């Protein structure tokens, strides 16, 4: 009986020890889970706060002097941007692929929304433009460096290798000014904001010093335009994209009052156009050279790209959707 009682006491002691150990483990696990949950919630909150302004910017460094470059809608998914917001290795430009000082153009030189545009924003290999892959001095670009002095730049996303989209005052609210290749020097674009679909210009050169080039609706897909610079108030160009009859204007630079030219296409040397603003469908000009000092030289109903921008508008309009999709789970 004594031996049996000792066994009962021993069993009870073992059971109590196991129960205590189990309780301690439960308390430890609960505490650990609580800490993990708090840490996870903190991480989620920090991630949410971070992505409010720099969505999916991998290694973005120094978005310098970008005043209100936050609230850039869809300026996301930039990788290794240096001195730029939410861009992939863009050097001084936002979301332009190797654009040099140009906006939304492929190798455009000093022109906006051209393929190979030089000095334009939102172009592939654009130098000094915003919204470019490897853009220099612009925000929301792949390898963008120094998107400086971009005041209120909105939606200047998706340019590859753009360089120096500097001094773009109010380049904000550029709706879908993306996907220009090798644009160069879209610098000194004052109020190049609210350019709706200013994408896809090929080889435009020097769309620099475009004062108030803002509100250009669909000013995209200009191929090999050279020196569309010094366009003062080239704003409110509705469907200046993808050459709604302003196609084939190579070097449509410095055209004074080439604005409101409806279907002014295939103009050679349309330079010195002051107030080229409100040019309805003055886009997609291919290799036009120096329609200089054409005061209101608007060609009515010229051919080559009546709404050819549709496929570009498709490509440019909300092209950031997949980036939103990619970051949707992270945001929530």
Curated annotation (Swiss-Prot):
Biased composition (Basic and acidic residues): 74-151, 164-176, 185-197, 206-326
InterPro entries in the cross-refs: Plasmodium_HRP
Keywords: Malaria, Repeat, Signal
Origin species: Plasmodium falciparum
Lineage, highest ranks first: Eukaryota, Sar, Alveolata, Apicomplexa, Aconoidasida
Stretch list, region Disordered: 62-332
Signal peptide residues on this chain, from the entry's feature table: 1-21
Pfam families: Plasmodium_HRP
Extent of Basic residues compositional bias: 152-163
Name by which UniProt lists this protein: Histidine-rich protein PFHRP-II
């Amino acid at each position: 009986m004594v031996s049996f009682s000792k066994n009962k006491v021993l069993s009870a002691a073992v059971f109590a020890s196991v129960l205590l150990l189990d309780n301690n483990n439960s308390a430890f696990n609960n505490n650990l889970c609580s800490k993990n949950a708090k840490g996870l919630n903190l991480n989620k909150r920090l991630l949410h706060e971070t992505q409010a302004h720099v969505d999916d910017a991998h290694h973005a460094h120094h978005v310098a002097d970008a005043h209100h470059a936050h609230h850039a809608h869809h300026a996301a998914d930039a990788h290794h941007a240096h001195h730029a917001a939410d861009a992939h290795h863009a050097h001084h430009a936002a979301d332009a692929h190797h654009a040099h000082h140009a906006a939304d153009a492929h190798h455009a030189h000093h022109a906006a929304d051209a393929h190979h545009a030089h000095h334009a924003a939102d172009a592939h290999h654009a130098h000094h433009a915003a919204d470019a892959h490897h853009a220099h001095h612009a925000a929301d670009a792949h390898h963008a460096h120094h998107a400086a002095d971009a005041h209120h730049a909105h939606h200047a996303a998706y340019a590859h290798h753009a360089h120096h989209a500097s001094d773009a005052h109010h380049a904000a609210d550029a709706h879908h000014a993306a996907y220009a290749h090798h644009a160069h020097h879209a610098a000194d674009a004052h109020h190049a904001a609210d350019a709706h679909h200013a994408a896809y210009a090929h080889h435009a050169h020097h769309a620099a010093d475009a004062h108030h080039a803002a509100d250009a609706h669909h000013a995209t897909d200009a191929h090999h335009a050279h020196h569309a610079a010094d366009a003062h108030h080239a704003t409110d160009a509705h469907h200046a994209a993808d050459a709604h009859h302003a196609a084939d204007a190579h070097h449509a630079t410095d055209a004074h009052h080439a604005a409101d030219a409806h279907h002014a296409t295939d103009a050679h040397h349309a330079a010195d156009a002051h107030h080229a603003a409100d040019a309805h469908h003055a886009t997609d000009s291919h290799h036009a050279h120096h329609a200089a000092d054409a005061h209101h030289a608007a060609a009515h109903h010229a051919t080559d790209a009546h709404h050819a921008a549709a496929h570009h508008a498709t490509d440019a309009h909300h092209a950031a959707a997949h980036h939103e999709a990619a970051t949707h789970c992270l945001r929530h």
